Amino acid sequence: MKIQLIAVGTKMPAWVERGFEEYRRRFPKDMPFELVEIGAGKRGKNADIPRILQKEGEAMLAAAGRSRLVTLDIPGKPWTTEQLAVQLEAWKLDGRDVALLVGGPEGLSPECKAAAEQSWSLSPLTLPHPLVRVLVAESLYRACSITTNHPYHRE
């Protein structure tokens, strides 16, 4: 099973790239984890936000292909680390790749939300999108360490 983090936005600060890469490289070879960046639509005073969301959503769905879609969204379901580990195991048994979708400043398109099989909430707080990348990478790695009995996670 491959996991993709499909996120709107490019040109992240160096600390985001380093933080994401630190956890990405730790993933086991049989569970590759990759970042797919989607260019953000140009936003300005007179920007057509619904159209921008639609275009970003189309690009995200195209990048995901036939993967299981999981949105990262405040109204989604919060998972503990242990529950995320159970989700990882369930996703493995499903046999499909997994695409985690992170929207831009206005969130995800209605099409992405409608196509998703699951929605995961990292927090009821609004988090900066660059930080979400690092949080997701660490959370998934921690959950993976539980499933493989690696000592990274301690209770």
Swiss-Prot record:
Q: Name one Pfam family in it.
A: SPOUT_MTase
Instruction: Spell out the GO cellular component terms annotated for this protein, sorted alphabetically and separated by semicolons.
Output: cytoplasm
What top-level class of enzyme does the UniProt entry assign? Answer: transferase
Its recorded reaction(s) are: pseudouridine(1915) in 23S rRNA + S-adenosyl-L-methionine = N(3)-methylpseudouridine(1915) in 23S rRNA + S-adenosyl-L-homocysteine + H(+)
Which SUPFAM superfamilies has this protein been placed in? alpha/beta knot
Specify the signal sequence span.
none
Q: Where in the cell is it found?
A: Cytoplasm
Role noted for this protein: Specifically methylates the pseudouridine at position 1915 (m3Psi1915) in 23S rRNA.
Q: Which family does it belong to?
A: Belongs to the RNA methyltransferase RlmH family.
State what protein this is by name.
Ribosomal RNA large subunit methyltransferase H
**Source organism per UniProt:** Aeromonas salmonicida (strain A449)
Gene (name only) = rlmH
